Structures are given as structure tokens and as C-alpha cells.
Amino acid sequence: MKKALLLTVIILVFCIAAEGCSGFPSAGRDPQESTSETAIESAEFEMLPEKDQAELLEERVALEAQRKEQLGAFYVPLPELGRETDLKTVKAKALYLTANVSGFNFNEDDIHYYADCIDSMAKGSPKPEDPDRLAEINKLEKALAICESTEVNALVIDIKNDDGLVAWKSDIEIVNQIGSNWSSPLKDYEKLIEYLKSQDIYCIARIVAFKDPYFARAMNGHAIQLLNGGVYKDDAGIAWVNPFDKYVWQYIVSISQEAALRGFDEIQYDYVRFPDHAADYNPITQFPGRDGRDKDEAIEEFLEYANSELLPYNVHISADVFGVATRSWDDKPEDIGQTWRKIANQSDYICPMIYPSHYGPGIYGYAVPDRQPYHVSRLALMEAIERNAAQRHPGIIRPWFQGFTANWIKGSIPYDAKAISDQIVAAMELGIDEYIIWNASNNYEPMTFFYHGRIDPNTRKPGEDILARSPAAAVKRYLDAEKGGKFSHLYLLTPISERHEDYDAFIAQRKTSLEILKNYEIINVVKDEGETYTAIVSGEYHSTAGTAIIHEAKYKIVPENNIYKIIKPELTWIP
């Protein structure tokens, strides 16, 4: 999604020209295009003549004054001229940490000691004989030791949590006005960030977006409203802010900008959605600012806005989605604002929370999905891959994996190192080499990350695509979709260049023509030169244009983004 900014001069010119870096993106503006038109390439601020530097600094002061007036209580300064950070990109393998744990004191000797213990365990050596010292090593030190001694190279740290509390003392006026940082557990964030940078650990700021009971209570006019007056609260008694409300957007993004200024490489939005159980609350609530839009439009537009406003800060953006987002289509029936393609197209990373414990009986064919960490993860990720393959430039899939035991589920299994890493193995076999482990208590088993010998490089048969689908199976699925009017399947199975990119336009065209396959027979599937195949098909189509009889017609089967897709032959209609 993002382009690295070559220097902050670019930001300066862009902000002045667009009257931007504040407010909201104008309709149709692509935040990715904003730098290319104004870039002064191959220049560095430090290498400019002193006079030019002075002029730019003077202009920056004026710009910041203008931005401060425009943004008011949401003002966050731009990165300092000459001190910009490069856009850092890694294949993140991450652990989640609360702000409380991240605020613990840490001792580097203890980190190294625990890292040595991990190394000994990985090599099959007896554990060290100093249990007293091990007992004194805190959760933060253990997490940092895991980063030192395993493939884990990233941490996801709460900066605004599920209660709406900001992790540190903030310079943002609105945060201080409402007091959302009253606890500030991450008091010495500079020390932690400095250490993470010194160890090349990728820093991800978790920002809970719209589940924010603190802001909803402090400024209840910006919460989801009840039709008969008052603020809506979910089944747990928690108030949510209104995702259609641009005032809320500014609040969330200002905290994101501050996290970027303080050294985070990525901003991750969790609860970037509406409350679940929408069927229960839809009839009794209202969303000021909705103006007839669907919920997934609000989430899409928020992420577009966040992209635009965070562009000068040189950070990636990621978005967490429910595991069901890999299975549902157009946010139905959930109606919580999470449509996969709309979020993937506005994020650098899309992070489905595919915890096996969160799937009900029968999902993916398993009575207790929690007992099948490998298979559930594999099937869910195959769905995610198929959805991503239908977009030109979607965010990279980086799944959340279950790092906890779900004791509340009848028939559940202990999620030990083997069960947790089974999920990682499933991802790696599908070519997904990033992940985040969730454990709310921040207790992580280091042996989880020594799984590599269990990866099977031959999970696919020769000729199958990444979904383990043969050319014959792909064309059959396509023809069944044409026969059954399954537009979402047709959208996924048609090459991007052969259809409308926008799904709404795609289905509008299909519904206008009323084209449907009445019957078909696959005569044969033959391999062409290279990686393509041809299916020989006979059958009959009906539409508003008449009838089209196909006799041994050739359907091309082509790989796109590692998935077989179908190019249908031209049809001749008889009125």
C-alpha cells in the first residue's frame, strides 16, 4: 500500500499544495499518489545548502502552525525535518504484549540468560539448574529472550487497549482532555523502543479502534446511539464509538501518529469493526453520519483516511479481522463492517484471527474445531488466499494464531508448543510466512518456534494450485457457480483482467444480463504448453439475449496468483 518517502521535503510540499496532512482526504484522492507528483528526488535534507535548510525549516514552522490551527485538539506534529525514518518492512513473526507487561523493567543479563535456556532446550539439553533465577525473569524479559533465540522478530504492543486506555503519557490535547491515558503503564517507552531498535525487533502498535468504552463515556455524543435515547451497550455492557463518525476517526489516527513518531514501525487496528450480534441491535440503534452507507463502507473509508493521514509518518498499516471474514461475503450475515476485499485493499497487512477455538461445531467438517489446529488453520488460510488472489494489490496475509488453551470448550485440547506450532506449519506450507501469536496473559512457550522439521513441502499433488485444486476441479467449480448463480465464486474464479475489479459492478452486470448456465458436460481437460490447461465443455446458456448452445467449447484454465482461474469463451446468442 505504501511508498517510502524519500525526504520530508516531499511532505512539506504536499501538505501545502493539498492543504492536507489534516482533515479528511478528498473524494477519489489516492494517498499513494500524493508523493510522486511533488517529490524532489535524490535529495537529502542534510545535504541541502544551509540557506535552503533554513527556508524549509521556516516553512515547516508555518505549516505546523497551520496544522495546529486546523487539527485543534487532535494535533500531532509531522516527523522532524532531517530525522525521518525509513519505511521498515519485515516478514513479521510476532508475539502480543499488553501495555502493562511492556512497561515492566527489563535486565539484559536476564534476557540473555533465558535465551541461553531456550537454546539449551532446543538442543535437547537438560534445563539449567537455577529455578530461582528463572522464576525472577518477568514476562517482558521472556518475550525479548524469545526474540533473541528464535525466529520471532516482532512484538505487537497495546498502545490503545480494549478499554480505550492509552498506554503512555501523551502530548495529544484530546487524550489529556478526556484523561484516557490516566494509567500510563508504559512509562519508560523510550527505553523499550531503543532496545527493540537495537535488536532489530519490528515494533507494531496495536490500537483498538471502535471498541472504546472510555471515549464513548467521556464523549457520549460520538458513541453508537439508541433510537429512544442514550448510548448503546453490547451484551457485556460495553459502549462502542460510532465508526461512521469522523471525529472518532481523528481521535484514533492522532494516537496512531504519535505511536509512529515514538518509533513504531506499524500501526495495527484491532476491533476495526462494529459490534457483533448486529441483528439484535440494528433495530434499536442509529449511527449519526451514516447517510445510507453500509457498515463495510465506514470501515473501508476509515482505513483510507488512516492511510492518507499516516503517509508522512512512514509506517505500515494492518487491520485485524474476524476469522469468519475468510468465509463470509460482503459482510453477510455478520453485518459488522468487515468485508475481506475492502479491508485488504486498504491495508498493508490483513490479519485474520483464525483461532480454532472460535469456530463452532461442524465448521470445516470438525465436531470440535479446537482439536484440529493444523487443519482448521490450513482451511481458513486457503479461503483467505483465494480472496486475496482476486485483488490486484491486497494486503499481505498475516494471521493471528491461538496461543492459549480454550478450557471452556467441551472436548478442547491443551495448546502446547506442538498445537500452537501446528498452526504455523499449516501457514508455512501454504507460503504464508508471517504470523502473530495471541495469548492474553503473555505467557509464551519458546519451543513453539522450533517446528521447521515438520513442514511438508509436498502437500500438493502435481498439477494442483495452492488450494490443492486440480484444473478439472477448478473448471467444475466455475461451471457449477455459473449454473447456480454463485456470483462470489465466479468473481473469485475469473481472472482480474477478464471482469470488473469492483464486485458491485461485476454482479450488476451479471444481474442485468440474467445469464445462467442451464446444463453442462465436461468432455475433457487437457494440458497446454506451459502452465495453462483447456477444458472442453458442452452445454447451454440462457440470458436476456436469448440462448447460447456450446458444443465442445474451449474454457481456458490459467494460473493467477497461484490459483487456477477460468476464461470463458465468447458466446453466440440466438434470440
What annotation goes with each model-predicted range?
Residues 458-484:
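Short, low-complexity N-terminal intrinsically disordered segments enriched in polar/charged residues
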